[in-house]
Regions:
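Membrane interfacial helix-start motif at the N-side
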Residues: 13-51
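Transmembrane helix recognition focused on a "late"/terminal membrane span
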Residues: 2-22, 56-148
């Protein structure tokens, strides 16, 4: 006996239609995973600008762990690092269907969407690498002398 779905539950047909729609689209969007603060607004997800203060908080905890070397600072930095990684992975997974639905709604075919997302993945890899290099240089070379 099949039970009736509740008002806010998806039906089996809706789930099957969504799975068919997402067929051939990777589960993880690498561009969204690597740089959600840039990728998100470019794909209509403006809430992603909240990643910037999150990254600044993470940068400060990492710098505190490096400069203070106390157990608390190191543990806090490790926790922040793991949580930030989890948030990025979850966003990379959840953003893919939203982005593909948006692109489809704008009339973009699947092959064009996938091609564009590959370009985004490469571009965001370069941008994220640049961010890490610049932040590391700042924290190791510039920041220690700022308050001296």
């Amino acid at each position: 006996m099949a039970r009736e779905p509740r008002q806010n539950e998806l039906t089996d047909e809706q789930i099957a239609a969504e799975n068919a729609f997402l067929e051939g689209v990777p589960r993880l969007n690498l561009g969204a995973f690597l740089m959600p603060g840039i990728w998100g607004p470019a794909h209509g997800l403006w809430i992603c600008i909240l990643f910037y203060p999150l990254w600044l908080f993470a940068d400060n905890t990492f710098y505190a762990a490096f400069s203070e070397r106390s157990l608390l600072a190191v543990v806090l930095a490790a926790i922040v690092c793991v949580m930030l990684l989890v948030v990025h992975v979850v966003f990379g997974i959840l953003s893919q269907p939203f982005a593909w639905h948006r692109a489809d709604g704008l009339g973009v075919d699947k092959q064009t969407y996938l091609k564009r997302e590959k370009i985004w993945a490469v571009a965001m890899a370069l941008v994220s690498l640049t961010f890490v290099v610049v932040a590391t240089y700042y924290n190791l070379v510039i920041r220690p002398g700022v308050g001296a």
